[in-house]
């Protein structure tokens, strides 16, 4: 017997749409207003810097000849499907897990769109301290990391009694 979607974690799919709009919108603005490698200082320790990532996190496998584009696209699709099944199986009231899953799905879809449309992921956030720069990243990456952190956090919280 099927259950109403609004009673499942899929009720939180609106957050996927919000993440996608913000992520793709920020990437569109970078692509329209920056040349590759351009940098604009926002404030101390934070720049906007247009970079292309042909690999995964920290440009992992970026120089692998192109096959990695499809490999990482497949991983993103698989993760999105698995997390949507998990959202369907969970209750809408399990907010922390469902928010985490929605953030990860939204981020994964944002980067998947880049891979399929451009052949690379658009990165633009350059955080640094002194001369040390963290890897350039984007809002989709941030959503994925926040979602993963929420899943870890949920594991440490006491379970509610049924």
Swiss-Prot record:
Pathway the protein contributes to: Protein modification; lipoprotein biosynthesis (signal peptide cleavage)
Membrane topology designation: Multi-pass membrane protein
GO cellular component: plasma membrane
One GO-annotated biological process of the protein: proteolysis
Record field: catalytic activity: Release of signal peptides from bacterial membrane prolipoproteins. Hydrolyzes -Xaa-Yaa-Zaa-|-(S,diacylglyceryl)Cys-, in which Xaa is hydrophobic (preferably Leu), and Yaa (Ala or Ser) and Zaa (Gly or Ala) have small, neutral side chains
Transmembrane regions: 12-32, 70-90, 102-122, 137-157
Cellular localization per UniProt: Cell inner membrane
GO molecular function annotation: aspartic-type endopeptidase activity
Domain of life: Bacteria
UniProt xrefs under NCBIfam families: lspA (TIGR00077)
Role according to the record: This protein specifically catalyzes the removal of signal peptides from prolipoproteins.
Protein name in UniProt: Lipoprotein signal peptidase
